[in-house]
Regions:
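Terminal intrinsically disordered/low-complexity segments used for targeting and assembly
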Residues: 2-7, 11-74, 231-275
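Amphipathic alpha-helical coiled-coil scaffold segments and their short linker/junction regions
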Residues: 56-57, 61, 67, 73-78, ...
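Transmembrane beta-barrel architecture of outer-membrane proteins
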Residues: 68-70, 122-124, 170, 215, ...
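Membrane-embedded beta-strand positions in outer-membrane beta-barrel channels/transporters
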Residues: 72, 126-128, 172, 270, ...
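Small/polar (Gly/Ser/Thr/Ala-rich) solvent-exposed segments
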Residues: 83, 103-121, 130-159, 281, ...
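Amphipathic alpha-helical coiled-coil segments
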Residues: 84-99, 160, 164-201, 218-231, ...
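A short glycine-centered flexible hinge/capping loop motif at secondary-structure junctions
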Residues: 203-207
Length: 396
């Protein structure tokens, strides 16, 4: 049995083209952030050229050390901050399933039993299917925003892995340098103590002065202070390494006797280098996600169309109520927000401003990236020149 007049609903659907034309006037034009980002990147100056550059695929290829690779592996598995980033990525993936589910029909079933004093027990069963038509692409925009959230979080996770690898590498190299400095200072102290002993023997024999003895003892004491400072600095770096690898107890490691070879990665053009950085790509994905949510907020001002089909049956027994003689109905509902105190319009404006904030956050990330690269290249260039001057001085 049918409860609807199809012709009446077809006539009402004729108004949909008019509603779609009105949607074009409600949704505003957003700034072309792609063009703005391209302009920002083109303003970056060329990088300094460094000699002896090497193409590497991974950060741990910069340092040839099995012990460092083992520590880095532990850090990737145990660092709590990195694990939080991974869990957040899994949350974004589940949220994407939620957003995708809004585009699909909702199906529900129910059963009931009714008993009264003046009638027999009646049993009922119903099956309903509801679906919201995506007239304006609002649900598609919401799903696209969820996809971009996954892209952003995945890139942030990659950036966090790169940052963690760089921090572990820096602490590892610092520990090697401090251990070498501590060994040198201990050897120097042994030499100073030997000198102090000779001066003391000469002083006892009346061949030296008290000033020479005081100077020797001061040098030994100063060296002892330097050893304490180096030892504490080494201990602090060990604690920092323990935090990075995500362990409460001190990690077991063996420092190499010599400095490891550290290669200089190849530097490409600024635009190519910046476009490969995961933090910048994540910031760009955040702009796109915010822009998609702005579209969703403005489309909330438009009418929505939902359809619902219900199949129900009633019988004197549970078996008889299982759709032996069902009654079906179809409901089409077109709802338009007329007045909500300006909340929907304010929400759309907020989303638009959040997109502008995402763009400024991209600019901030870009500035930090350029600063990091330029400072690293400048420091490396200065170290190369210092090494050349030292080699010249030693050869003289």
């Amino acid at each position: 049995m049918s409860n609807i007049n199809p012709d009446r609903y077809l006539k009402k659907l004729a108004y949909l083209p008019l509603l779609m034309l009105s949607a074009c006037s409600i949704t505003p034009e957003q700034p072309d952030y792609v063009e703005l980002i391209s302009v920002e990147q083109q303003r970056v100056n060329e990088w300094q050229n460094l000699s002896q550059q090497t193409h590497v695929a991974y950060l741990n290829d910069l340092v040839d050390s099995d012990m460092f690779d083992e520590l880095l592996k532990i850090a990737m598995q145990s660092n709590p901050d990195l694990q939080q980033m991974l869990l957040t990525l899994q949350i974004r993936q589940s949220q994407r399933i939620q957003a995708s589910g809004e585009k699909r029909p909702f199906i529900s079933a129910g059963a009931s039993a009714q008993n009264s004093s003046d009638s027999d027990t009646r049993f009922g069963a119903d099956l309903s299917v509801s679906w919201q038509a995506d007239l304006w692409g609002k649900l598609a925009d919401n799903e696209r925003a969820a996809d971009l959230d996954i892209t952003e979080q995945s890139l942030l996770y990659q950036s966090a892995r790169d940052t963690l690898a760089a921090e572990v590498m820096q602490v590892w190299l610092t520990l090697i340098a401090q251990q070498r400095a501590l060994d040198i200072e201990q050897q120097r102290q042994a030499s100073l103590q030997q000198t102090e002993f000779f001066i003391l023997q000469r002083y006892r024999q009346g061949l030296g002065t008290l000033e020479d003895l005081d100077s020797a003892r001061s040098a030994v004491a100063s060296s002892s202070a330097d050893i304490e400072a180096l030892t504490e600095s080494f201990r602090q770096q060990t604690i920092q390494l323990k935090t990075l690898v995500g362990q409460v107890n001190n990690p077991e490691f063996t420092l190499p006797a010599d400095y490891p070879d550290v290669v200089i990665p190849a530097i490409d053009l600024p635009e190519q280098t910046l476009n490969r950085r995961p933090d910048l790509r994540a910031a760009y994905a955040a702009i796109q996600a915010s822009s998609a949510r702005t579209e969703v907020a403005y489309k909330d001002l438009l009418p929505s169309l939902s359809l619902q089909a219900v199949l129900e049956d009633v019988g004197s027994s549970p078996r008889a109520s299982l759709f032996t003689a069902p009654v079906w109905s179809l409901l089409g509902q077109l709802t338009a927000p007329l007045y909500q105190g300006g909340q929907l319009r304010a929400e759309a404006e907020i989303r638009e401003l959040e997109t502008a904030i995402s763009y400024q956050q991209y600019r901030d990330t870009l500035l930090n990236a350029v600063t990091e690269i330029e400072q690293a290249l400048s420091q490396e260039q200065a170290l190369v020149k210092q090494q050349q001057h030292i080699e010249t001085a030693l050869a003289s």
